[in-house]
Structures are given as structure tokens and as C-alpha cells.
A protein has these predicted regions:
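N-terminal targeting signals for export/organelle localization
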Residues: 1-31
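Short active-site neighborhood of thiol/selenol oxidoreductases, capturing the structured segment around
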Residues: 41-53
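Conserved redox-active cysteine motifs that mediate thiol-disulfide chemistry
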Residues: 52-64
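Short helix-loop-beta junction
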Residues: 66-76
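Thiol-based oxidoreductase modules, predominantly thioredoxin-like and allied folds used
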Residues: 74-87
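Structural micro-motif
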Residues: 93-102
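Non-catalytic, surface beta->alpha helical segment in thiol-disulfide oxidoreductase systems
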Residues: 104-132
Length: 132
């Protein structure tokens, strides 16, 4: 019985690691920030934040994290994108769920796509890497 619990525990750890890798990762093919997206300062990294009106996690979790990062870190552009109203962008970045975020480097190329909620530490790490 103890062996089964141990095997199940190991399986769950691997499942959590795999899930984290799936949700957040480097983009395989770099996509350039579309020209129609206006940013305040093109020399800074940019985060596209995909949300919808009926997304509770967008309002209660992801948006507060992004606002907090904006206040503390400040060195990036934040662009809100309604996933329903922006079909082209949603398709371009293969957004499957909301909230989702796409992090672009200073040169406008996509670096990370986070499907689902991305916590402050993960986004901060991605923004630091996108600056270089």
C-alpha cells in the first residue's frame, strides 16, 4: 500500500512539472509584435494580456498581478487584449484559454506565451529575460 502511495506521489510531482512547462514556455517560432498594437515605449518589453468579460480569474487574479508588476517593476508596456474581440491576435498567438499573456522582448519578438494564469514571479523572470 505504501509503495502505491509513493508511486502516485511521484507521478503527481511529474504531472505538476509537465503542466507548468506546458503553461509557460518559450515560443518555438518568434512572432513579431503586430504593428496595430500601440505601445508607450518601444525600447521596453511588452506584455499582451488576453482576457474576456466573463473571466473571473482574469479580474481577480491575473489583472491584479499585472498591475502590481507595473507599479513595482514598471519597465514594460502592458497591452490589454479582449480575446473575443481580437480573433486575429488570439489565433496568431494560439491562445487557448484566458487569462493568457505573451511577453515580447525589446526588439518586438515574442519570447514567452503563458496559457492560463501566470504568477508574479514567473512574469518577472520572463520580463527580466526579455530585456536582454
Amino acid at each position: 500500500m505504501l509503495e502505491r502511495i509513493l508511486v502516485l506521489g511521484i507521478f503527481l510531482v511529474f504531472l505538476l512539472i509537465f503542466q507548468k512547462k506546458f503553461r509557460s514556455g518559450r515560443t518555438k517560432k518568434s512572432i513579431v509584435l503586430p504593428k496595430e498594437i500601440e505601445v508607450k515605449d518601444s525600447s521596453l518589453p511588452t506584455v499582451l494580456y488576453f482576457w474576456t468579460d466573463n473571466c473571473v480569474q482574469c479580474r481577480t487574479s491575473q489583472k491584479p498581478v499585472l498591475k502590481n508588476l507595473e507599479e513595482e517593476f514598471g519597465g514594460f508596456n502592458l497591452v490589454d487584449v479582449n480575446a473575443i474581440d481580437s480573433d486575429e491576435l488570439t489565433s496568431l498567438f494560439n491562445i487557448k484559454t484566458v487569462p493568457s499573456t505573451v511577453v515580447f522582448s525589446n526588439d518586438g519578438s515574442s519570447r514567452f506565451i503563458n496559457n492560463g494564469f501566470a504568477d508574479k514571479e514567473e512574469l518577472l523572470k520572463q520580463l527580466e529575460e526579455a530585456k536582454n
